[in-house]
């Protein structure tokens, strides 16, 4: 099964929007996907600046087969960058619900 990277807004949101990332991860795993959740990934403890976090996230994104987008991704500078890079690399990027519908069909 494909490995999906979860992209969505974090900055300025309560709890960095982590609950939405964890919900998406749970649903995508239940549908059979492997999931790379930047809210969970190791090695981000030392990331105190946005640039540091994005460097780590973009390295992870490059190892995935597609991107599962959370609501509000287009209003997030980081998530929009992740999706743009995914598309530029030829990876599929769709809302989480689209991946779930596709897996169910």
Predicted stretch roles:
Residues 1-105:
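Conserved catalytic or regulatory cores that recognize and/or transform ribose-phosphate-containing ligands
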């Amino acid at each position: 099964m494909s490995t999906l990277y979860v992209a969505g807004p974090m900055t300025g949101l309560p709890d960095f929007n982590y609950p939405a990332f964890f919900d998406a991860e749970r649903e995508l795993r239940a549908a059979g996907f492997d999931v790379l959740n930047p809210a969970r990934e190791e090695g981000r403890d030392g990331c105190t600046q946005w640039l540091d976090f994005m460097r780590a996230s973009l390295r992870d994104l490059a190892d995935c087969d597609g991107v599962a987008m959370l609501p509000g991704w287009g209003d997030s500078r980081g998530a929009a960058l992740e999706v743009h890079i995914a598309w530029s690399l030829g990876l599929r990027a769709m809302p989480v619900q689209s991946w779930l519908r596709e897996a169910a069909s």
